[in-house]
């Protein structure tokens, strides 16, 4: 029985004609599109490591973390200037001031910056300061925002919605691609399940990594910080994600010399842990995934 609005992986060629793998595509059955962000190449042989604070709180805090993640081996800097919070009473970020701090951090460290745009009104401003625009989990199906990000002329990091199927996730990416922008990197960041919150923040869906690689030519990375919500789990989750073929990682890092982070402090790792993860990542090839496939 056909149900209105129901789609499956079999519908991908119709739902995502721009991003779905096909025999006549230049990417064929197994090639990945390389998305370049100021010299950092997603989808290439070497997995990319992105590190930085959950939120840009102060100039000192952000610059300290930026220096630390660069020393640890990260290739890009993350940090939220605009913050989507569960409660309106939580810290909402530093906005435009935070974007300027991120720009200063990039100029000092040389690390390209990825940060989130939460609203269509923010996209132009974020694109002015950042090298890559992030669309967060809560906005994965904010279709006007996706289209605006696609028109901004910058690569886009699209996080999976916490309750989104693979088809819905790729359908969201198609909104960006329809604007003529194929420089999209997908990010698995954990999904909600019956056990969510019992012993981890979300459930890290490792199985989706080979599925993404089988059905689209876009690179896919993993956010082990939000997926686990526990700092001690971030390193093993990172290793597992790379074993499953992730093209990279985006990880929250705290500066131990400054105050406790205002957001998600318990999931932030220290620079030493990031350095171990980076060494593991850079010793691997994201294109050689033994024994992991999704027909």
Predicted regions and their residues:
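Non-catalytic terminal accessory/regulatory regions of metabolic enzymes
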Residues: 1-49
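Conserved beta-strand positions in the central sheet of alpha/beta enzyme cores
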Residues: 10-21, 78, 114, 134, ...
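N-terminal small/glycine-rich loop or linker at the start of catalytic domains
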Residues: 32-54, 85-88, 213-222
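Active-site mouth loops of central-metabolism enzymes
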Residues: 47-64, 88-92, 112-116, 136-137, ...
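Glycine-rich, proline-tolerant flexible connector loops at the mouths of alpha/beta enzymes
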Residues: 78-96, 255-265
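Alpha-helix-loop-beta-strand connector modules within alpha/beta enzyme cores
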Residues: 91-115, 149-155, 206-220, 244, ...
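Catalytic beta/alpha-barrel core
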Residues: 94, 110-122, 131-144, 155-166, ...
């Amino acid at each position: 029985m056909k149900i209105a609005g129901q789609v499956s992986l079999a519908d991908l060629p119709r739902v995502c004609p721009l991003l779905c793998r096909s025999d006549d595509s230049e990417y064929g059955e197994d090639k990945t599109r390389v998305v370049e962000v100021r010299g950092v190449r997603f989808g290439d042989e070497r997995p990319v490591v992105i590190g930085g604070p959950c939120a840009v709180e102060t100039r000192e805090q952000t610059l300290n973390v930026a220096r630390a993640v660069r020393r640890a081996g990260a290739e890009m800097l993350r940090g939220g200037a605009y913050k989507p919070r569960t409660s309106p009473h939580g810290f909402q970020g530093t906005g435009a001031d935070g974007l300027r701090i991120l720009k200063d951090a990039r100029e000092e460290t040389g690390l390209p910056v990825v940060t989130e745009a939460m609203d269509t009104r923010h996209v132009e401003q974020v694109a002015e300061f950042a090298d890559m625009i992030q669309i967060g989990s809560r906005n994965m199906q904010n279709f006007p925002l996706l289209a605006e990000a696609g028109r901004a002329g910058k690569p886009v990091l699209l996080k999976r919605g916490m309750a989104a199927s693979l088809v819905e996730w790729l359908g969201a990416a198609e909104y960006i691609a329809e604007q003529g922008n194929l420089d999209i990197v997908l990010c698995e960041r954990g999904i909600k399940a019956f056990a969510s919150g019992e012993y981890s923040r979300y459930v890290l869906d490792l199985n989706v990594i080979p599925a993404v690689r089988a059905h689209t030519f876009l690179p896919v990375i993993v956010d082990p910080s939000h997926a686990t919500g526990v700092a001690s789990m971030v390193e093993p989750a990172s290793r597992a994600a790379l074993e499953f073929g992730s093209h990279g990682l985006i990880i929250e890092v705290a500066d131990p010399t400054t105050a406790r982070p205002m957001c998600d402090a318990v999931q932030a790792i220290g620079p030493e842990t990031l350095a171990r993860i980076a060494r593991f990542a850079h010793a691997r090839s994201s294109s050689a995934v033994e024994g992991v496939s999704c027909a």
